[in-house]
Amino acid sequence: MKKIFTFLLFSQISYAQEAPRYLFDDLYFADPSAHVFNNKIYLYPSHDIDTEVKDPTNGGHYNMKDYHVLSLDHIGQKKTKDHGTVLKLEDIPWAEKQLWAPDVAEKNGKFYLYFPAKDKEGNFKIGVAVSNKPEGPFTAEKKPIKGSYSIDPAVFKDNGKYYIYFGGLKGGQLEKYRDNEPLAQAKEPNDQENALSPKIALLSQNMLEFAEKPRDIQILDEKGNPLKAGDHDRRFFEGVWIHTYNKKYYLSYSTGDTHKLVYAIGYNPYGPFTYQGEILTPVTGWTTHHSIVEIDHKWYLFYHDSKPSGGKNHLRSLKVRKLEYDEKGFIKTMNGQD
């Protein structure tokens, strides 16, 4: 039997105070995956455009067509560098549309860009593109990862192994699958059933395939019970990220239609993870997608909102702010309207 670890939730919410700042004014970017490579901060975002697709059903207006790489020498740098287009939709043989939130991992001097896109049948798959430099350009593999589905890949290195996390509801199509197999028709669990979970799989040595079948990640309440589908304030929706702090594993994600960024804590990459609280209250705009990174012994939250576009959900701008822990290791909640 797996031992379940539980934590006492906050009796009072403590708030981090440092003001956030925008990172790039010239174009709209979102979903930033931040990493430090060669002592430089690299951002791997999605690239928002004012698309001709106006129907927001299932995220159709998030119609991204390429990826850029951005970089900073340090957090306080006034101008974020745009390395330009590093991968285009037309250069991905299997992909039809919608280059959503990516992530990058480094292994043995090579850089692997993991990205979701819809194939010719309209199903999201996860692809890989490779470069010899963190700033790209990247060359896509001819086919998506076998057995992949849904959106929002995030890759995590732990003890020399690389794990990929993924999944997203609604437009992210996670409801279309059970036990890694497609359903004849998408089916949401009812409110009293267990919520759908983000997925995890060990990556192969060449970083291009799953080394195992994806597994569900359990997210538990304070009593050790899986969060329910009707618990929209806490259950997983999309945008999973993982980091470690003081030998604990912090799984963070968006709650979707309640627009919160929240987290859970566990003791290994597979979990289970016990829900702890909010990292960020709702921002301007529908989506919340982030990364959490340690830089020069300080922790930062990278994320986006839609304030500069006047609240247009599909035109988002990147932000960064300092992330703080209290003395017990809980993350201090931040105000998304700052």
Language-model features, listed with the residues they occupy:
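Generic cytosolic/nucleocytoplasmic N-terminal low-complexity/intrinsically disordered segments
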Residues: M1-K2, N39
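Basic side chains
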Residues: K2-K3, R316
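Sec-dependent N-terminal signal peptides
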Residues: K3-I13
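Carbohydrate-active catalytic/glycan-binding domains of CAZyme proteins
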Residues: A16-D338
